[in-house]
From Swiss-Prot:
Disulfide topology: none
Chain's gene name: rplW
Gene3D superfamilies: 3.30.70.330
Described function: One of the early assembly proteins it binds 23S rRNA. One of the proteins that surrounds the polypeptide exit tunnel on the outside of the ribosome. Forms the main docking site for trigger factor binding to the ribosome.
Family of this protein: Belongs to the universal ribosomal protein uL23 family.
Alphabetized GO MF terms: rRNA binding; structural constituent of ribosome
Tree of life domain: Bacteria
Lineage: Bacteria, Pseudomonadati, Chlorobiota, Chlorobiia, Chlorobiales
Pfam family, one: Ribosomal_L23
Protein name: Large ribosomal subunit protein uL23
Cellular component aspect of the GO annotation: ribonucleoprotein complex; ribosome
Keywords for the protein's UniProt record, in alphabetical order: Ribonucleoprotein, Ribosomal protein, RNA-binding, rRNA-binding
Signal sequence residues: none
HAMAP family: Ribosomal_uL23_B
Amino acid sequence: MANPLLCPLLTEKSTGLTEKKGQYVLVVRPDADKLTIKDAIEKKFGVSVTSVRTINYLGKLRAQNTRRGRIIGKKSDWKKAIVTLAEGQSIDYYSGTAQKSEG
């Protein structure tokens, strides 16, 4: 299977989860399972993952009216993973490395 991690999901809510609870929100491949996501994060960032929660989103139907009639399409399905790291560990999304805070 290809790398299940696609990109971080940076929203106000996900940033708040990162700051308060040490949880990171990522967009992952829809066919990825929790163990695959956990292994990929531990391998890529070198951190220990405590838990992984996943949420499946179904793509919405979209319609567009044109001169030739109505065209109906569908947005892709996607999956979100909320990953909790061990105490004192963090991930820097932009450099792709993990940081351990001392204290």
